[in-house]
Regions:
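Cytosolic regulatory regions built on CNB/CRP/Popeye-like sensor folds
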Residues: 1-146
């Protein structure tokens, strides 16, 4: 199973990275700076499982570099790239992930724990709205409908 790698970027570098991603576009600088202090930087190598299928979702990730595949029962159902996230629906609802996410190339990820993820609505209301919208169309929610 995948584990966190040591943090290699400063909070300032992370804030710059967040600003460059569509999900965080237009958020106030002070919110991005604060969010950057909460994010961990992690990495994965090709073939590494980032989220296993049928396992509770405990972390929320944003891809900042590389590509991953979303699989259900070993069958690819989607691709993820820079700026993509997954499992919002499962994380929000305390459900096991109906899909697996596997690195296709070396990945760099920004990661929040489930507890940190649940702090977003209070501290970052605009971002919270965007995440709820993404949850409605996330691969893990759509996989439940199949």
């Amino acid at each position: 199973m995948w584990t966190d790698a040591p943090r290699h970027e400063t909070d300032d570098d992370l804030a710059v990275t967040l600003r460059s991603l569509d999900l965080f576009a237009g958020l106030p600088s002070h919110e991005l700076d604060e969010l950057a202090t909460r994010c961990d930087v992690s990495s994965a190598h090709p073939g590494q499982v980032i989220q296993a299928q049928d396992v509770p979702v405990r972390l929320w990730h944003v891809i900042v570099g590389g590509h991953a595949v979303v699989q259900r029962d070993g069958t690819p159902i989607g691709l993820l790239a820079r700026g993509d996230t997954w499992s919002e629906h499962s994380l929000l609802n305390g459900l096991p992930s109906p899909t697996a996410v596997v690195a296709l190339s070396p990945l760099t990820l920004l990661t929040l724990s489930r507890r940190q993820f649940f702090e977003i609505p209070e501290q970052h209301p605009v971002l919270a709205g965007r995440l709820v919208a993404r949850s409605a169309t996330s691969a893990d929610r759509l996989a439940l409908l199949v």
